[in-house]
Swiss-Prot record:
It catalyses: L-glutamyl-tRNA(Gln) + L-glutamine + ATP + H2O = L-glutaminyl-tRNA(Gln) + L-glutamate + ADP + phosphate + H(+). One of its GO terms (molecular function) is glutaminyl-tRNA synthase (glutamine-hydrolyzing) activity. It comes from the Eukaryota. Its main location: mitochondrion. This is Glutamyl-tRNA(Gln) amidotransferase subunit C, chloroplastic/mitochondrial. It is an enzyme of class 6 (ligase). Allows the formation of correctly charged Gln-tRNA(Gln) through the transamidation of misacylated Glu-tRNA(Gln) in chloroplasts and mitochondria. The reaction takes place in the presence of glutamine and ATP through an activated gamma-phospho-Glu-tRNA(Gln). Subunit of the heterotrimeric GatCAB amidotransferase (AdT) complex, composed of A, B and C subunits. HAMAP family: GatC. It comes from Populus trichocarpa (Western balsam poplar). It holds the Pfam family GatC. Keywords: ATP-binding, Chloroplast, Ligase, Mitochondrion, Nucleotide-binding, Plastid, Protein biosynthesis. The gene is GATC. InterPro entries: Asp/Glu-ADT_sf_sub_c, GatC.
Length: 141
């Protein structure tokens, strides 16, 4: 008592309407019954129709109130869209930890001695050798 779903696609790109055949194998009938479903593209980018929550509940043999049917519809749509996102092939995308991956864009920091040290010390309001004292920037309370 199981079901198998086969998605048939024609051509290299996915069509606007794809055809899904559901084969129901039952012990009672010798030949499997075939039901045909078509899927349509929707405005939100998903290629599947909105879920029929009432039919899903009947198939799962659970009872839902009309409010629960309305509540679970968008949630089931999110799960379907998430699984569609997981099927995206990312093998051709190189892994990265940040957007800037072109290498070392910073100059080398080479220490240099400033020639006119006394002019800087004269311009600073508070100086204690060898430090320049500045007012606190962060107030820690």
């Amino acid at each position: 008592m199981g079901s198998r779903a086969v998605l048939l696609l024609k051509g290299p790109s996915p069509p606007k309407h794809s055809i899904l055949f559901l084969l129901n194998h039952k012990k009672i009938s010798p030949a499997p019954s075939i039901r045909r479903f078509t899927t349509k593209a929707t405005a939100n980018g998903s290629s599947l129709e909105p879920p029929d929550v009432a039919r899903l509940a009947e198939t799962a043999r659970i009872s839902l109130t009309p409010q629960q049917v309305e509540e679970f519809g968008p949630k089931i749509r999110q799960v379907i869209d998430w699984h569609a996102l997981l099927s995206v092939d990312l093998d051709s995308v190189e892994p990265s930890i940040r957007a800037d991956t072109e290498g070392d864009n910073l100059r080398h920091d080479n220490p240099e001695t400033f020639e006119n040290r006394e002019a800087i010390i004269a311009a600073v309001p508070n100086y204690e050798d060898p430090y320049v004292k500045v007012p606190k920037v962060l107030n820690k309370e």
